Amino acid sequence: MYNMMETELKPPAPQPNTGGTGNTNSSGNNQKNSPDRIKRPMNAFMVWSRGQRRKMAQENPKMHNSEISKRLGAEWKLLSESEKRPFIDEAKRLRALHMKEHPDYKYRPRRKTKTLMKKDKYTLPGGLLAPGGNGMGAGVGVGAGLGAGVNQRMDSYAHMNGWTNGGYGMMQEQLGYPQHPSLNAHNTAQMQPMHRYDMSALQYNSMTNSQTYMNGSPTYSMSYSQQSTPGMTLGSMGSVVKSESSSSPPVVTSSSHSRAGQCQTGDLRDMISMYLPGAEVQDQSAQSRLHMSQHYQSAPVPGTTINGTIPLSHM
């Protein structure tokens, strides 16, 4: 638009274009230099800004052409109609002269190339969202056939929650350890009565995991997961892994182990009473669950007893 501001309609001699060199590209220069191209007649603003642009460019040689155009546009809007009148008349004269010289002229604007949409430019990585579905719903309620997808989404959730991938990997390895040998025969008798309710209720694990983060007690969730059936869905297994990794074993002395064991026993009995039908099974199940929690919290921690186990003399 500003290619014609610095030159007259018919310049007597070629003059260097001082103000309009910044807003033309190579294709614009080729079309400008071609003799077949017919320029559009200048409007009133272009007639007025032709002298003002040259003056402002001389006063501010380092100012960019776009900034000059912004300032000239603001000044043109502030002019009154009486001040604009001579430039409007000059633009009408130039338009009439242009129509006389080029009667067959028709303005053909150049078509702009289509740019990519923002949603096409900035797409999410391939593993975070399922194609055509909700990523959170797919990550929580997965079935048994989506093992690789669960691991990938768990890694992404680990970064979101502030936990490193190493913590999840260590807890997944601990899930593969065999159970304590003294508990195998004792737990087989209680395996079936424990799971008379539906296992699909664990699919709301996002809310329970957040409560487990706040409470900081992974003993119930781990003992519950170890007594579950082998046909457990991977979504619930992922929730157990997250709840276990949310709290590390506490670094305490041997004297405080007995107090912690008593508190855990009381909490376990309160939790077990919500699920077990009779009171005669509470003591046995509490002992077995406490054994399991001690087995999975038995990682060597500095400052604890041998293997980090809690003495059972208080039971």
UniProtKB/Swiss-Prot annotation:
Residues 1-41, 235-263, 296-315 are annotated as: Disordered. GO terms for molecular function: chromatin binding; DNA-binding transcription activator activity, RNA polymerase II-specific; RNA polymerase II cis-regulatory region sequence-specific DNA binding; sequence-specific DNA binding. Residues 304-315 have a biased composition (Polar residues). It is found in: Nucleus; Cytoplasm. It holds the Pfam family HMG_box. At the shield stage, expressed uniformly in the future ectoderm. At the 75-80% epiboly stage, becomes localized to the presumptive neuroectoderm; strong expression in the presumptive forebrain, weak expression in the presumptive spinal cord. At the tail bud to 3-somite stage, expressed in distinct regions of the future brain, the anterior margin of the neural plate and the future retina. At the 12-somite stage, strong expression in the central nervous system rostral to the hindbrain, including the optic vesicle. The gene is sox2. This is Transcription factor Sox-2. Residues 38-106 bind DNA. Its main location: nucleus. InterPro entries: HMG_box_dom, HMG_box_dom_sf, SOX_fam, SRY-related_HMG-box_TF-like. The 9aaTAD motif is a transactivation domain present in a large number of yeast and animal transcription factors. The lineage of its organism: Eukaryota, Metazoa, Chordata, Craniata, Vertebrata.
